[in-house]
Every structure is written in C-alpha cells, then in structure tokens.
C-alpha cells in the first residue's frame, strides 16, 4: 500500500446543504448559493478522513444547483452543474458518470430518496459533515 490518499470527487447538493442551516437563505437563494460555492473552493485538494476509506483527497468539486440558484457562477475550482429539471436527477446522473469513469464520488446530501437512487459505489455524507469541514 502506497499510503497515498484515495482521490474523491465531491458532489454537493447545494439546495440541501443551504437548507440545513436556518440562516435566511430563503430570502436570497442565489446569494446563498453563491456564498456556499465560494466556501467550497478551498476544499479543492483538501485531505479528509472518512470511515469507509481513511485518508482521502478531494481532487474535484461538483456543485449541483437548481431553480433560482441556476444563474449563479462559481469559483474556478468548483464545477457548477445547472439542473435542467430537479437537482436530484442531475446528482444521480453525475454520480453515475463519475463511477463509470472509475472515480469515487462523495455526495453531500441528507435527502433519503436521493441517497437510495445513488450508485452503490458512491460515498455519502450529510450536510453536517460538510458544514463542520467548512467551519459553519
């Protein structure tokens, strides 16, 4: 074993993470999404520890936005995926693409229905994990 951390693609359900904190996000969804996207940028290249893997490195960040947040722009290190329909379906499609390419997706969502639709190879954490990582 080389000791190198596993590489992960962080896939964030932006609406779900925003909704996990009662900070007034509902008054300005686009503004709240923009702030969250900016907070994600420093996680590119960050090392994290997961029970399933041990040490892992976030090598890519994908953030799925929908509805009023679809018009937002993200920082360079965050790929913003604008859902044509519902965000959950976009997350499932992206996660399937990643696993088919041999990548390990780490999906951030508390949505139980979405969790059931994700491929078996996807790792899943809740918004609390991400909020703690971001110091929120």
PLM region descriptions:
Residues 3-4, 17-136:
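Nuclease catalytic cores that cleave nucleic-acid phosphodiester bonds
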Residues 8-13:
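Short, hydrophobic/glycine-enriched beta-strand segments
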């Amino acid at each position: 074993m080389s000791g190198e951390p596993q590489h992960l693609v962080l896939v964030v359900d932006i609406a779900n993470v925003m909704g996990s904190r009662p900070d007034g996000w509902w008054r300005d969804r686009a503004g709240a999404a923009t702030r969250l996207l900016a907070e994600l940028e420093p996680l590119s290249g960050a090392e994290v520890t997961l029970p399933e893997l041990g040490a892992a490195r976030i090598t890519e960040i994908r953030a799925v936005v929908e509805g009023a947040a679809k018009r937002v722009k993200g920082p360079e290190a965050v790929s913003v995926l604008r859902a044509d329909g519902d965000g959950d379906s976009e997350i499932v499609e992206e996660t399937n693409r990643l696993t088919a390419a041999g990548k390990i997706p780490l999906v951030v969502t508390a949505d139980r229905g979405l969790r059931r639709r994700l491929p078996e190879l996807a790792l899943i954490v809740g918004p609390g994990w991400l909020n703690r990582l971001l110091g929120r």
